[in-house]
Amino acid sequence: MANIKKGDLVQVITGRTQAKGGDRGKQGRVLSVLVERNRVVVEGVNFVTKHVRVGQTQRGSKTGGIETVEAPIHISNVALVDPESKKPTRVGFRTETVEKDGVSKTVRVRYAKKSGKDL
């Protein structure tokens, strides 16, 4: 089970400060997780400028120009935000037994180490 999943609220914990034009301290939702590259794409963080070639679409319109898109950031540079204190926290796992229809099942649950709340 992964520490950070799509849809989690994370905070950038390394990099240049916001006063110098960086992203450290910014919070955003995880848009996608690139597991094989150990990277995540965070909403509103790590913008890059892309030059897109003008090309034909199927409907005949031409698209292209300069776009700004979110680039992946390494997973070690972000921390999950505690739902209670809204500050970065580490993630822990604990096993819980859940009974459903008379059958007990063991499930791994993620929790915030600062507050102990389930994620």
UniProtKB/Swiss-Prot annotation:
Pfam families, per the entry: ribosomal_L24
Keyword Lyase: no
Domain of life: Bacteria
A GO term from the CC aspect: ribosome
Keyword Amino-acid biosynthesis carried by entry: no
InterPro entries for this protein: Rib_uL2_dom2, Ribosomal_uL24, Ribosomal_uL24_KOW, Translation_prot_SH3-like_sf
GO biological process: translation
UniProt cross-references to CDD domains, sorted A to Z: KOW_RPL26
UniProt keyword list: Ribonucleoprotein, Ribosomal protein, RNA-binding, rRNA-binding
Signal sequence coordinates: none
GO molecular function, one term: structural constituent of ribosome
Oligomeric form and interacting partners: Part of the 50S ribosomal subunit.
NCBIfam families attached to this UniProt entry: rplX_bact
Family to which this protein belongs: Belongs to the universal ribosomal protein uL24 family.
Record function comment: One of two assembly initiator proteins, it binds directly to the 5'-end of the 23S rRNA, where it nucleates assembly of the 50S subunit. One of the proteins that surrounds the polypeptide exit tunnel on the outside of the subunit.
Record-given protein name: Large ribosomal subunit protein uL24
Lineage: Bacteria, Bacillati, Actinomycetota, Actinomycetes, Micrococcales
